[in-house]
Amino acid sequence: MSVSAFNRRWAAVILEALTRHGVRHICIAPGSRSTPLTLAAAENSAFIHHTHFDERGLGHLALGLAKVSKQPVAVIVTSGTAVANLYPALIEAGLTGEKLILLTADRPPELIDCGANQAIRQPGMFASHPTHSISLPRPTQDIPARWLVSTIDHALGTLHAGGVHINCPFAEPLYGEMDDTGLSWQQRLGDWWQDDKPWLREAPSLESEKQRDWFFWRQKRGVVVAGRMSAEEGKKVALWAQTLGWPLIGDVLSQTGQPLPCADLWLGNAKATSELQQAQIVVQLGSSLTGKRLLQWQASCEPEEYWIVDDIEGRLDPAHHRGRRLIANIADWLELHPAEKRQPWCVEIPRLAEQAMQAVIARRDAFGEAQLAHRISDYLPEQGQLFVGNSLVVRLIDALSQLPAGYPVYSNRGASGIDGLLSTAAGVQRASGKPTLAIVGDLSALYDLNALALLRQVSAPLVLIVVNNNGGQIFSLLPTPQSERERFYLMPQNVHFEHAAAMFELKYHRPQNWQELETAFADAWRTPTTTVIEMVVNDTDGAQTLQQLQAQVSHL
């Protein structure tokens, strides 16, 4: 009997089972212990293969692929700390709803806790973060193939969001020629190999339930808060709120067109919050709200009812309102709860939103990151998409810009870390094939710098804007101790990215004014390559501009 041959047959069943659940993209890191999985994936023509040498980046690449494809994405890594590097992407997927399937190769049980090389305790290492965890046994013909395939099917068939961890121990030898070992074991699955359906079919129910008193609440004074959702959902939510005559407070990830722009400015005005106090119901569609003042208002508002609609399970209200947590697809829920045409009940807020936008426009000429955030909609590629980083950049865009309704926007706003942002953007571009504008800060770019390797091969133009304000200037907005701020919070690195771009043979521009930036964009959108645009700005100007605008609008 050939151990290596049976390892591969065992792995082939696992990989084939994944295809029955919509897995098309598979991300593979180099490793020896994962050889059976890697070779099985390579031999399966149903997969689109992606490779990367950094497992942390690989996990985020898979995350980006899953964001756009809306399908589960598989990841293969070897044993040891390679597995631990998948933790950040798994955590993010659990919070934002992407489906990841982590296939982690492992040493067999007799090599654990005995000093064997690259052997750690992998079963259960992700604690409660996976939706489902499977610790497979060492491959053996004593276990029928139908057990293996039905075990995989059960985990994936009930997967609605988040990650599945499948730990796969393999004994040596890992290499060798294929023979007939295990062929009859495989063939006991019969015509399943020619079919395209799971062996065990389980359909998770996510049917929207109609709220029978909706006809009553839709006649009241309401507010719509729009969080993260798809582009199509964003357009539907905007129309729904407009028909109801309810003010819509749209997050940067809502893709609603933000009909009341600059919410994080005007929510600091007492006239706005006073008017919002008249709301009898708040309906929040989508989660992951960005703006600080929106979150402050959301925490303090006390309507008669607060409804949260999202297809992600679990609690999504840190303010613990009295109301309803409705687990449903947003578009389906809107269809079950049609709007009734009514006149807008808010008078002050539309006026304040317009005045706030005019205040932002009055400052748009200076060459800075706040102004870039405001202008970002001018630079979006046609039929393209936007990927927004975390920290200061997403807050500036949320507060100062007005993105087009239905324009795809992606970000990692679950745990809101700055790790893996470039890798995630690479996955977003690969899955869609669309022109992509990605914008991150300098520390975020440094954190995931080796992901520039993933940007060498793109199917459409990709522009990566690195806003270099020399450190984590988000901390300039926080009451961090002045004497310790630079050393322990901002951590300026005094670097530029020209040589990083050159290392990976990417085009690079460092514009000094708006005209040079626009010229760089015009050049970048012409060819299906990656262009790095480094925008060097004064360290604290962006944070200061935001603070000044917030103060100005609060006194309108």
From Swiss-Prot:
Reactions it catalyzes: isochorismate + 2-oxoglutarate + H(+) = 5-enolpyruvoyl-6-hydroxy-2-succinyl-cyclohex-3-ene-1-carboxylate + CO2
Database matches in CDD domains: TPP_PYR_MenD, TPP_SHCHC_synthase
Keywords from the UniProt entry: Magnesium, Manganese, Menaquinone biosynthesis, Metal-binding, Thiamine pyrophosphate, Transferase
Cofactor: binding details: Binds 1 thiamine pyrophosphate per subunit.
Coiled coil: none
EC number(s) given by UniProt: 2.2.1.9
NCBIfam families in the record: menD
UniProt-recorded name of the protein: 2-succinyl-5-enolpyruvyl-6-hydroxy-3-cyclohexene-1-carboxylate synthase
Organism, scientific name: Shigella boydii serotype 18 (strain CDC 3083-94 / BS512)
